[in-house]
Amino acid sequence: MNPVSKSLTSTMAHIHEKIDFTVAIFVVQNGKVLLIHHRKLEKWLPLGGHIELDEDPEQVALREAKEEGGLEVELLGERPPTTGAGTRALIAPRFLDIHRISDSHEHIGMIYWARPKNGTVSLARAEHYDIRWCSIDELEKLEPPMTEAVKWYCQRAIKEVTDGACPGGQLTSS
């Protein structure tokens, strides 16, 4: 591993020099989305994290929801009805994006919608200042303000999960 990769890995859990894969989980309940105020990034974000080499995106989403929010969640989306030896279908992310982290590093984000199944919301104090459920109206009042992209995903998740459907068909649980 070169020195740049090593320093990125030790500070931000990056496992690749230029691009890492991440998961964001927009957990919705009663018309509100669960957000964390991230200590290191100083931003309001959904639950989420990096996909490690031995994990698939669903595993990461479930793990991060528990670690960062104290919740067991059900992922919402479509799982293809594929079968066969050596094949396991995954719920497709609702959206994908790529966002710049630094001049030399980007994240490909897999964006999931979810509902809580079990657990009590809890703050991961080492990583976050705050955790809270926010309505669409409350998104505008958060300090520091969230990015327009995160706000858009929040609004879309609240609307689609509350309505119980998304383009392309009904949401199905994991």
Question: Where is each model-derived feature located?
Answer:
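Short connector loops at helix/strand junctions that flank enzyme active sites
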Residues: 20, 28, 46, 68, ...
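Short secondary-structure capping micro-motifs at structural edges
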Residues: 13, 62, 97-101
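Acidic, metal-coordinating catalytic segment for phosphate/diphosphate chemistry
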Residues: 2-25, 30, 87-90
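Conserved Nudix-box catalytic region and its N-terminal flanking loop in Nudix hydrolases
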Residues: 32-74, 79-83
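Active-site segment of metal-dependent pyrophosphate-handling enzymes
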Residues: 70-118
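Short secondary-structure boundary/capping segments
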Residues: 17, 25, 100-104, 122-124
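Nudix hydrolase/Nudix homology domain
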Residues: 39-44, 105-111, 115-174
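Residues embedded in well-ordered beta-strands
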Residues: 24-26, 32-34, 111-113
